[in-house]
From Swiss-Prot:
This is 6-phosphogluconate dehydrogenase, decarboxylating. It catalyses: 6-phospho-D-gluconate + NADP(+) = D-ribulose 5-phosphate + CO2 + NADPH. GO terms for molecular function: NADP binding; phosphogluconate dehydrogenase (decarboxylating) activity. Pathway: Carbohydrate degradation; pentose phosphate pathway; D-ribulose 5-phosphate from D-glucose 6-phosphate (oxidative stage): step 3/3. Homodimer. The keyword Oxidoreductase applies. NADP(+) binds at G11, L12, A13, V14, M15, G16, N34, R35, T36, V76, R77, A78, N104. GO terms for biological process: D-gluconate metabolic process; organic acid catabolic process; pentose-phosphate shunt. It is an enzyme of class 1 (oxidoreductase). The lineage of its organism: Bacteria, Pseudomonadati, Pseudomonadota, Gammaproteobacteria, Pasteurellales. It comes from the Bacteria. Its EC number is 1.1.1.44.
Length: 484
């Protein structure tokens, strides 16, 4: 009798191939399928040569070569393609079989697929996979959610192939039902946008604001790896700043300053608006990429305003430390806002997400892996009900001690004309969030004046609503809409 596979993988692009090789390295028998049969042959004759990986040349063949309950992972483009493969697979599956979507699917699609497939007896998992090609090959961060009945069957495989912390803890655990895993992956990607933009703002301040050269900036980022800023993105930034082109000049200086995006940052911002969460830093990071895309327009407008940035002549060591503190404090706000969004979704959908465990999922293997994720985990383990990460004593102390330098860097950037949308958004958010009184009383009065939207009074119990006839004309009709 032929040997059956432990899991099947559909999709032999680089991510799919590397996950298959990772599974093989961890002792699992994998059946590989691609819609283009020649890709299967090429893979088996190339990267998968002399392994235990099995090829399949139709979906029927794939299903026949798997142990029951069948476990099939889709590594295909998000969207309609996922639904097409699910529909094509169903005739070859039985009740209890498991489909795993490992792509960057939008969580409402995962919600829908989990429910509709459960009605057909198929258990569905939507899992975020982060870490890129290298992570897929040697250990990614994996964020599974969906039908929890499927988790015991796929847990040994997914945890085996995931990244591990220095304590050998897998960066993979059950996130929650339905689309919880893909939602957490979406927020991860949004935080990634924020982290990258914050680093870029620090880089521009060092380069244009302080007039530092690339060797000096490389040394600074390399030094920051030995601080609380230690992270994958700081690490690769140090490498990038040191990299020379063929002519010996820094390569990054020759890269066109227009940044691309795939849309997950936008998804994060849209969901923040839908849930009413002030995800100000991440949305500014998305908009910064949008601004960068207008290269020709930026060149034209720059000639209208004749902006010249004059480097600061003060003690550069003090400014470098101030930038480090501003970067760290802003990063804390980015993660704080991200976890506020995760909490709101978890409560809204009753996902019961463990926030400390979520931080652990990102500790290794993914793009935002960093040392202080361990501190985030500690904060939520000490206080699972923690609403704002900055309220934890460890993070509160960092924010408080960074405040003066943080303000100094943002103010100076505005003074000399360096755009700093994310650092400015971060400190502005904290100023607003830590204010007992905001000018929203005037705003609500304006709404009541022109739209009879009503207001609450400070001298009356909450949820008691009032309307004023501000002009003495018209009636006392009040809008029924107070909050969005």
């Amino acid at each position: 009798m032929s040997i059956k596979g432990d899991i099947g993988v559909i999709g032999l692009a680089v991510m799919g191939q590397n996950l298959i090789l990772n599974m093989n390295d961890n002792g699992f028998k994998v059946v590989a399928y691609n819609r283009t049969a020649s890709k299967v042959d090429e893979f088996l004759a190339g990267e998968a040569k002399d392994t235990n990986i099995i090829g399949a040349y139709s979906l029927e063949d794939l299903a026949a070569k798997l142990e029951k309950p069948r476990k099939i992972m889709l590594m295909v483009r998000a969207g309609e393609v996922v639904d097409q493969f699910i529909d094509a697979l169903l005739p070859h599956l039985e009740a209890g079989d498991i489909i795993i979507d490992g792509g960057n699917s939008n969580y409402p699609d995962t919600n829908r697929r989990t429910i509709t497939l459960a009605e057909k007896g198929i258990r569905f998992i939507g899992t975020g996979v982060s870490g890129g090609e290298e992570g897929a090959r040697h250990g990614p961060s994996i964020m599974p959610g969906g039908n929890e009945e499927a988790w015991p069957f796929v847990k040994p495989i997914l945890q085996a192939i995931s990244a591990k912390t220095d304590k050998d803890e897998p960066c993979c655990d059950w996130v929650g039902k339905e689309g919880a895993g893909h939602f957490v992956k979406m927020v991860h990607n949004g935080i990634e946008y924020g982290d990258m933009q914050l680093i870029c703002e620090a880089y521009q301040f060092l380069k244009d604001g302080l007039g530092l050269n690339y060797e000096e900036m490389h040394a600074i980022f390399a030094d920051w790896k030995n601080t609380e800023l230690d992270s994958y993105l700081i690490d690769i930034t140090a490498d990038i700043l040191a990299y020379k082109d063929a002519d010996g000049e820094p390569l990054v200086e020759k890269i066109l300053d227009t940044a691309g995006q795939k849309g997950t940052g936008k998804w994060t911002g849209i969901n923040a608006l839908d849930f009413g969460i002030p995800l100000t830093l991440i949305t500014e990071a998305v908009f910064a990429r949008c601004v960068s895309a207008f290269k020709d327009q930026r060149v034209a407008v720059s000639q209208l305003f004749n902006k010249t940035i004059t480097p600061i002549s003060d003690d550069k060591k003090e400014w470098i430390e101030a930038v480090r503190k501003a970067l760290l404090a802003s990063k804390i706000i980015s993660y704080a806002q991200g976890f506020m969004l995760i909490r709101e979704a978890s409560e809204n959908f009753e996902w019961n997400i463990n926030y400390g465990a979520t931080a652990l999922l990102w500790r290794e293997g993914c793009i935002i892996r960093s040392a202080f994720l361990g501190n985030i985990r500690d904060a939520y383990e000490a206080n699972p009900g923690l609403v704002f990460l900055g309220s934890d004593p460890y993070f509160q102390n960092i924010l408080q001690s960074a405040m003066a330098d943080w303000r100094k860097v943002v103010a100076k950037s505005i003074e000399i004309g360096i755009p700093m949308p994310c650092m400015a958004a971060a400190i502005t958010f904290l100023d607003g969030y830590s204010s007992e009184h905001l000018p929203a009383n005037l705003l609500q009065a304006q709404r009541d004046y022109f739209g009879a939207h009503t207001y609450e009074r400070t001298d009356k119990p909450r949820c008691s609503f009032f309307h004023t006839n501000w002009t003495g004309r018209g009636g006392n009709t009040a809008s029924t809409t107070y909050d969005v």
